[in-house]
Amino acid sequence: HHVNRCAAITEGSNGFPGAAGRLPAECATIGQVLQDNGYSTYWIGKNHNVPEEDISAGGNRSEWPLSKGFDRFYGFLGGETNNWYPDLVEDNRFIEPPSTPDEGYHLSKDLADQALRMLRDQHSATPSKPWFMWFCPGANHAPHHAPQEYIDKYKGKFDDGYEAYREWVLARMIERGIMPEGTELTPLNPMPEDMANKDDYVRPWAELNADERKLFARMAEVFAGFSEYTDVQVGRIIDYLEQTGQLENTLVFYCADNGASGEGSPNGSVNENKFFNGYPDELSENMQYLDTLGSAETYNHYPTGWAVAFSTFDSMLPRPLTDS
């Protein structure tokens, strides 16, 4: 990270050599390496590599994907975007989404549509040319947005709480040989007491009141629906490769950047931007959005307890550090 001057995310770049946020010429991207070796290169979805000051219609394009070894780009610049109304970029220009949520729009589907369009163009024009596609959907990063029918499929699935879910996941890991017999779960709050912020502590499920359990379980249902909906879109790409006889000659890597996020705070949020602005989430206020979680009316994120559960068997969570 320090050699490529990207020791922090672009929003945290400070100008010092190790964290300047701009790749030096001697550090090539995988796109540049493959492009130089005769590949077509495509980047779809999230690009969190462009400095903030360059993310504008008149901004410098030197750190944008087309300047970093990619023939085509379709997605968004930054850490996250609204899945119903995303800030879209095509190649080197900002664009409006091709349709609205009322017309069936969702970012995950749009990204898969564009990926398929590029792959079809490639297969039609230069079928013998190798290609590389970096497909990075906004999922499962917050905000957690999904079509209602996918959310409803998980109704009641998380009512037992995050501790019970952790136990279930660990048992399946041991059963499948992923973890050895005798493996024990990490503490629900793994930070040493002298380092922990008590306001960040995950409360045991048994200590939550009825409304909290209802809200927290619904947030997990939304996340699960979001996950499955995105899997379906990835599956469309895999299906196309199989239908065109390319799958057996394609390497598919599933990668994750940092696992489940703790940015939802112990109480979850109907608007994740509250966390970034230090605005507290009130249960009574959030309960008003119970039935609209995951829709265009919310910018929701699950509570930290689910981040702990969904990160089983990891002990720690990614979360921005503050001075407080």
PLM features per residue range, with description:
Residues H1-S324:
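Formylglycine-dependent sulfatase
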